[in-house]
């Protein structure tokens, strides 16, 4: 197996695992995973869309297509229970899917040796994680699975059957 194939596999499996549980929570998208709050499913999905937009920005210097969502879904934002504070679940999901598809197209256009290229503009404070094209794509899959745990905890809190 080549590195590119392994990265694509990780992106595909993590995406499937995430969207399955995200879709189960579409009717309870602002359910917090714990009584103390945390990252609810709508926030997770918007946050992941924002991170997907970091790939073209880091690798190609393009603007992040979800940058306007940073106040709602950025690393230092605080999830709130009011769904009216956010774009709709359908809008956030569509944006996430669109950006993931764009990133898969970018990955498909790369050669194996391209994966070792240094990222043009890695996010400030995340230079190590986004140091190369390959690492940048791999971070998406790993990051996605970290946040999937928040969604499964929210599902449990909402008592939505798996």
Q: PLM features: what roles do these ranges have?
A:
Residues 11, 15-18, 22, 55, ...:
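Hydrophobic alpha-helical core bundles mediating ligand binding, dimerization, or RNAP-core interactions
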